[in-house]
Amino acid sequence: MPRHERGGSGTSSSDLRLRKACDRCHAQKLGCQREAIGAKCVRCEKADKPCTWSISLRNRRASTRKEQLPVHAQQQQQQQQQHQHQPQHATMARNENNEEQAQEDDNDDEDEDILYSDQLTPSEAIPELHSPLGDPHNRLASESLDPTTMPIDLTSFLISDGGLGLMTPSLTNPGSWLGETQLGTTTTTTTAITTATLIGEPPRFWSSATGGLPHTPSAGGLTTIDLPPAAFEMNLPGVPPSYTPSHQPDQPPPPKTGTPALSDPQWLKELFDNNARLYRNWHAVSSNMTTNQTINPLFPMSTTSQSHPSSAAFADEAVQLSTQLIHILRGLLHQHHESTGHRPPTTPKPRARAEDLDPDHSGLDPGSLLIVLSSYFRILEIFTMLSHALEATAAATGSTTHYHTPRATPPILRLPAIVVGSLDLASNTSLSTVLFLEVIEDLLTTLATLVLSIAQWPSHPHHATSRREPGWQGSDLHAGSDRLGLQIQGKEDEIRRVIRAIRARLGRKGDKAGV
């Protein structure tokens, strides 16, 4: 950098390109005063320091532009020769941009004597303020969309379904899933069951202490209930789920070593409550079945009658009870693993057989295993009746591609109201039927896996029985388990056959791999 000294040993100069302040005063952002032209400033004179002046930044840029002007003119001439067929206004716009840029540089340098400084930026002075996501030179900025490498802990963020508006809290009728007024009462019960079963998430289980489910599905319309956003959670890819104590499912305390698998009475109570409600649901569906399903509806069309609830409420409750049973069985498997240290088989046999249901081979006590099998069998019976009603409805319409019920013929089975985001599937019965069949298949697949995993537990020492002991091997109870295994296999085959028939009427010839 060329420097010119005034006073002292330097030559006196009145070059207008020099700064108004000497280098020391300019660096310290201080005013520069001198007694006469060519003399040292007051501060340099008092400090006995050399007083030098440098050319301002604005004048240096102007000098550089003048030196580079011939080269710039030559380059511009070459560009004009290469693009001589382009419109002239493009060259004019480029020249105007160059002039505006030069004018902005001059305006920025007018106050350079006062504003120019070499101070650090806030992010450089305080590293904590620096954000790697906003730095274009930082390598992490291009990788910030990957949750596994993002330098921010995403486990603390809860993305709720209600906040994003992607899905409704429940797959089917929110009136019977998330709270519904019981007949003759004014209290409402809120449950936090979601479609987590379909995506592998543990469902938010209902509490028996709060009242559980309504004993009888109401015939009223949908009930609007405000749920907190924290009640629902969506997991990000690559990020483990995070549960807070406010919405974490209630887990039973680990049982003591050597105790039966069902040591906690809370699981027994929930299992018996679920079985009782499954029986009431099965009784309500079976008692309303008609002989001629192609003419008379399964349930009356009216949803205002207190004595005749609609079929949609019973179908919706069947899905809900199946989801709750899945949660109970998952809790039993987890508790069994914690108490015995034995992990149940992850890939059990896909079909229920008599040897799989042998009580001698199970870690559960006979009564608990019987309740588990009874609940699963009730669900199979309920879905068998509902699938037959769907098949009769599809046959009554006479359509093989579209499942639209004529206005003159009431539907044999009314499906639950399914709403995905802002899309109400009530107007598209074919899509509602396909989605309902997918739900049935998913629930039965999960239940079959859990039931067979529980039935294939190794025998617990506390439950080990001799094959000669009266009441087990060769007894009526053991023979009953054989018959139950055959009945379960028959129900599964029947449901698969009906689902294939319905899909064939809807235009879907293919069938999924087994229930």
Curated annotation (Swiss-Prot):
InterPro entries reported in the protein's UniProt record: Zn2-C6_fun-type_DNA-bd_sf, Zn2Cys6_DnaBD
Biased segments, Basic and acidic residues type: 352-361
Claim: Transcription is one of the keywords in the record: yes
PROSITE patterns per UniProt: ZN2_CY6_FUNGAL_1
Entry-linked SMART domains: GAL4
Segments of this protein annotated with the region Disordered: 62-110, 125-147, 231-263, 336-361
DNA-binding region: 22-51
Keywords, comma-separated and alphabetical: DNA-binding, Metal-binding, Nucleus, Transcription, Transcription regulation, Zinc
One GO cellular component term: nucleus
Keyword Plastid attributed: no
A biological process term (GO) from this entry: positive regulation of metabolic process
Record field: compositional bias (Acidic residues): 98-110
Signal peptide location: none
Ranges of Low complexity composition bias in the record: 74-89
Molecular-function annotations in GO: DNA binding; DNA-binding transcription factor activity, RNA polymerase II-specific; zinc ion binding
Localization per Swiss-Prot or TrEMBL: Nucleus
First-listed, main subcellular location of the protein, grouped into a coarse class: nucleus
Record function comment: Transcription factor that, with himD, probably co-regulates the him gene cluster that mediates the biosynthesis of himeic acid A, a ubiquitin-activating enzyme (E1) inhibitor.
Name of the protein described by the UniProt record: Transcription factor himB
Organism: Aspergillus japonicus
